[in-house]
Amino acid sequence: MTELKAKGPRAPHVAGSPSSPKVGSPLPCSQAAGPFPGSQTSDTLPEASALPISLDGLLFPRICQGQDPTDEKTQDQQSLSDVZGAYSRVEATRGAGGSSSRPPEKDSGLLDSVLDTLWEPSGPGQSQPSPPACEVTSSWCLFGPELPEDPPAAPATQRVLSPLMSRSGGKAGDSSGMAAAHKVLPRGLSPSRQLLLPTSGSPHWSGAPVKPSPQPAAVEVEEEDGSESEDSAGPLLKGKPRALGGAAAGGGVAAVPPGAAAGGLSLVPKEDSRFSAPRVALVEQDAPMAPGRSPLATTVTDFIHVPILPLSHALLAARTRQLLEDESYDGGAGAASAFAPPRSSPSASSTPVPGGDFPDCAYAPEAEPKDDAYPLYGDFQPPALKIKEEEEGAEASARSPRSYLVAGASPAAFPDFPLGPPPSLPPRAPPPRPGEAAVTAAPASASVSSASSSGSTLECILYKAEGAPSQQGQFAPPPCKAPGAGGCLLPRDSLPSTSASAAATAAGAAPGLYPALGLNGLPQLGYQAAVLKEGLPQVYPPYLNYLRPDSEASQSPQYSFESLPQKICLICGDEASGCHYGVLTCGSCKVFFKRAMEGQHNYLCAGRNDCIVDKIRRKNCPACRLRKCCQAGMVLGGRKFKKFNKVRVMRALDAVALPQPVGIPNENQALSQRFTFSPSQDIQLIPPLINLLLSIEPDVIFAGHDNTKPDTSSSLLTSLNQLGERQLLSVVKWSKSLPGFRNLHIDDQITLIQYSWMSLMVFGLGWRSYKHVSGQMLYFAPDLILNEQRMKESSFYSLCLTMWQIPQEFVKLQVSQEEFLCMKVLLLLNTIPLEGLRSQTQFEEMRSSYIRELIKAIGLRQKGVVSSSQRFYQLTKLLDNLHDLVKQLHLYCLNTFIQSRALSVEFPEMMSEVIAAQLPKILAGMVKPLLFHKK
């Protein structure tokens, strides 16, 4: 853009001089007829002092006396077409009349002369009235219930506007042009909206009555349409200018002499004939004006708060219609207290409120608010706070914070850029977060309607203060800390900050949770409510609306670390690093156990073998530490069966509910018992689960064999089958009492019993033979004991030799009763179907637990770690070898069952069903044996 410079200084305009145009006087122009039918103008109107000199001749060309305002509209369009770089085409028409000084030209002389006036500040002796101060620092005037009436607001406005008046030696009234030059008109209004200032003698609206000079004039926002006349039935804006009651009834005039008082500008929406969205009219009211400002300049200044968004009129109309379908605004005292700062004193009412919710310039204090008094841009909500739009993104960050009257909360409002902060601010707090509705704390009549209460569960308070009491309700505003405590309780670090927020913080005001932002270097957008989301840039991340509330996070296990199981080393109590050698231990105990086992150290305790092993004193006594490792079940072979047992934290299965009450000793009490450990003395401590297994061991079962008769093959096999039937019933009863077995599916329980009943019976045979006759004979039952001679006389001598291997292994290994009990349970869990069990996870957990119990049972008697590992290998190897041994028994049993009639051998009913249903599957390889070691 070409830079425009002034040619030179001009002579100051002297008010009252007939030869030069006066400040704000209309410019002369030709009497060319416009395309629109003109209306009568008044020749007796005084000079329009409210016209800003900065725009004199550039955007607002002076008109001749008697010229129709529509002619002026046409000429304004011609002059605006020659000015490049204008943000919007805005025409302001005033009352016709006055003398003319020069016609509008298209050469550079006009621009230079206008720029000379534009860049000259006002002098100290010349001033013009200005509208109230709240229009300068507060948000756009469309959002306001009342107008502050106190004249003391003018000096505060001059202090706030002082940064804008930096040049010295100016002329009267130029400050308004300077302020207008710094402001950017909304693109939503450009180029289809203009400001038309009708005269008091000729109304711009069809059917409007002619008002006298004291009646307030109206400025209406119209669509720029050259094809329609203003008197036609189809203009975009129709209706009468709304004169407000109360103090505004006898308000000022549209154009007054420099010494007269003019009313402030107010906005009254008007309904359109084609669109339901209200159009905005500017109405002047009675209020003192600050020197050096004109109403139109203030209007242009206030338009900076409109969001610069390319919003179509159809979308705006649809959005406004949606908002206006709610309850009509019930204004009055409740509304004033709900949306405006308290007006208890003149100083409070005249204090400028930066970023306030609703500046007091919509209607007079005594006037009843209009039913359609909703602004065109935004969700102006009634006191019921029917907030239907979630504010997110730039719309929540760019708008000025809503004012909350929270007791004890520090002010957290931000002045509009680039104005400095005012001397005093009412206490206010920012909205909780994007997407969350805010409720004022002052009025008792404010309530949340059903429209807002139907929101998502994310709509709740995220940040709570410690000192200020939180307001009741779902959408209560978050109070900040007490004044002087600095920022809010939980500032959002991820959100960008601005210089305005930093300045407010330095000035003593606490920054809001979401400071106002300046987008792309433009001034901050100070509009008050949500606009359409589709036209807003995504400043905040989209996941902000998905933040969990603190109340929900504290109740959810995902956010509560206390609900997670704490991994502690079972040896020293330190933090466990994993499962090492079959036990959940730390890295230190893992290395200690490995070195002690490989080095075969003979540690001796200097005390009584009861030293405390914890995180601090674990290195004091290696003997007690190694003993504790063995008691916990650490063995070198733990890695070999890790893939089978899926080792987890030690679990006491005695907590499982049993079908019949069984006295289970407390493990903590058992561990608290003192025990001694020495090379010549065994540990006198039995784990509680092993004690439980011992208590549920079946009683002695008799075979019912008649020893008085000579043995025959059929009689022996029949007696063995009868014994097997009784033992099968005993296995079913024992398994039901087994801790953890009832947790499996009922089908899995039946399958495991049918697959393992032969293994359990032959394993029990070996234990009884080892225990009662030291493995010298086969002790089937007290009434059926086969020695080697009887074995040879039987028809199944080879089978007896196979079964005889088990007690011999028991004798060789010197198996203890605790080891036998654990191995017996593992035999029950040693064979599963190829497709797995229904409750496979519970089965694996149960099997892993009993493997651990076997390790404990081994550690009860073994004095060294190496011997414990070797013994675990030997015992598990014995369990693996039983698969081949039992397969021989299955084959013989099935053959005998098939030839039972020929052999005259009786098979009981239950045993017959098991043999017929399961033995063919087992022999066909349709089962999966679980092995501890690879073959």
UniProtKB/Swiss-Prot annotation:
Give GO terms: molecular function aspect only.
nuclear steroid receptor activity; sequence-specific DNA binding; steroid binding; zinc ion binding
Phosphoserine is found on 20, 81, 130, 162, 190, 213, 294, 345, 400, 678
For this chain, the Swiss-Prot or TrEMBL PTM comment says: Phosphorylated on multiple serine sites. Several of these sites are hormone-dependent. Phosphorylation on Ser-294 is highly hormone-dependent and modulates ubiquitination and sumoylation on Lys-388. Phosphorylation on Ser-345 requires induction by hormone. Basal phosphorylation on Ser-81, Ser-162, Ser-190 and Ser-400 is increased in response to progesterone and can be phosphorylated in vitro by the CDK2-A1 complex. Increased levels of phosphorylation on Ser-400 also in the presence of EGF, heregulin, IGF, PMA and FBS. Sumoylation is hormone-dependent and represses transcriptional activity. Sumoylation on all three sites is enhanced by PIAS3. Desumoylated by SENP1. Sumoylation on Lys-388, the main site of sumoylation, is repressed by ubiquitination on the same site, and modulated by phosphorylation at Ser-294.
Motif range (LXXL motif 2): 115-119
Annotated region described as AF3, given as residue ranges:
1-164
Biased composition of type Polar residues is found at 191-203
- Record's compositionally biased regions (Low complexity): 232-246, 335-356, 435-452
- Regions of biased composition (Acidic residues) lie at 220-231
Q: Name one Pfam family in it.
A: Prog_receptor
Q: Where is this cross-link: Glycyl lysine isopeptide (Lys-Gly) (interchain with G-Cter in SUMO)?
A: 388, 533
Annotated region (AF1) at 456-548
Q: What does this protein do?
A: The steroid hormones and their receptors are involved in the regulation of eukaryotic gene expression and affect cellular proliferation and differentiation in target tissues. Transcriptional activator of several progesteron-dependent promoters in a variety of cell types. Involved in activation of SRC-dependent MAPK signaling on hormone stimulation.
Concerning its family, UniProt says: Belongs to the nuclear hormone receptor family.
Q: What is this protein called?
A: Progesterone receptor
Q: Which organism is it from?
A: Pithecia irrorata (Gray monk saki)
Encoding gene (name): PGR
